[in-house]
Amino acid sequence: MTHASLPLALTQGDPAGIGPDIAINAWAKRRENGVPPFIFIGDPDVVASRAALIGVPVNIETCDPESAVSLFERAFPILPLPVGFDVQAGQPHVGAAHATIKAIEMAVSLTVEGRAAAVVTNPIAKSVLYEAGFGFPGHTEFLADLALRQTGKPVTPVMMIAGPKVRVVPVTIHIPIKDVPTALTEELIVTTCRIIDTDLREKFGIAAPRLAVAGLNPHAGEDGALGTEDRDVVHPATIRLRKDGIDAFGPLPADTMFHDAARKRYDVAVCMYHDQALIPAKALGFDDSVNVTLGLPFIRTSPDHGTAFGIAGQGIASETSLVAALKMAAEIYARSRVGA
């Protein structure tokens, strides 16, 4: 199979959520939105019932990745992964956890084996997976473990939200805010920023990335008056990064980093915790932002929203963020093939 013929490996996510809805909508609007070919890893019965529920005609064909690209124009290609029970839209069930996890594992395997171009994941419900014994805080950490299992090499995953107006990275991710000051170390900031710098160059074609580093505390700590972390941890990290030739500057007061003029000064905002990064990202591009995992030996993107159980099966879920995630994955893959 040539590189040009590789499909994207799209996971079902939680089958009771809007993953099936938005995948169906993305395929139905593939021509008008220029959606790159994907193979959907999930349950054909879920797709068929959800398509009927939301009133979108879809021609389903089960296939392997090698056939997906040629099928994509006329059919919704599925690599079958039965859930094992009758899924009801909007009603999450622990019985779906195994298939949800297995779909992610299959997508990673296909991509590492060179049978798919990239992994694109639909939203999962962490609480449902935890009930089934899932031992990871979220997608990002699970993907890092899969990368280790597939390649034998440990990785440090970095979550970046990329939208049309801003890119953001939280240095700490899925931990309680009370634990952030302890988890936030100079070494973690330096490692995260090195990965950002490398991947913005290699995956996004930015020749000289500019990294704006936010402070942890209000006003970036006011030189220790409002907390010592920015003075003692964040600032030394930026000094080390600049010595390494990485254009990282800060710590900056986070409340002045996201207005129009400020965003022109950097390529990515490096934030200290989850909500410091994701609130501005979603405020500036809720429908068309993409979650990209940097630092992995394969490409992974996902829509920047959750399972939205409350609207699953109602025909009102927007596929915009998923389409953006599919397009970004395809663009990164195409860029990676230049000169390969």
From Swiss-Prot:
Binding site for a divalent metal cation: H174, H219, H274
Class of this enzyme: oxidoreductase
Enzyme Commission identifier(s): 1.1.1.262
Origin: domain of life: Bacteria
Coiled coil: none
Sorted UniProt keywords: Cobalt, Cytoplasm, Magnesium, Metal-binding, NAD, NADP, Oxidoreductase, Pyridoxine biosynthesis, Zinc
Cofactor note: Binds 1 divalent metal cation per subunit. Can use ions such as Zn(2+), Mg(2+) or Co(2+).
Binding site for substrate: H139, T140, K282, N291, R300
GO-annotated cellular components: cytoplasm
Cofactor(s) annotated in UniProt: Zn(2+); Mg(2+); Co(2+)
Main location class: cytoplasm
GO biological process, one term: pyridoxal phosphate biosynthetic process
One term of GO molecular function: magnesium ion binding
Family per similarity comment: Belongs to the PdxA family.
PANTHER family assigned to the protein according to its UniProt record, in alphabetical order: 4-HYDROXYTHREONINE-4-PHOSPHATE DEHYDROGENASE, D-THREONATE 4-PHOSPHATE DEHYDROGENASE
Function: Catalyzes the NAD(P)-dependent oxidation of 4-(phosphooxy)-L-threonine (HTP) into 2-amino-3-oxo-4-(phosphooxy)butyric acid which spontaneously decarboxylates to form 3-amino-2-oxopropyl phosphate (AHAP).
Descriptive protein name: 4-hydroxythreonine-4-phosphate dehydrogenase
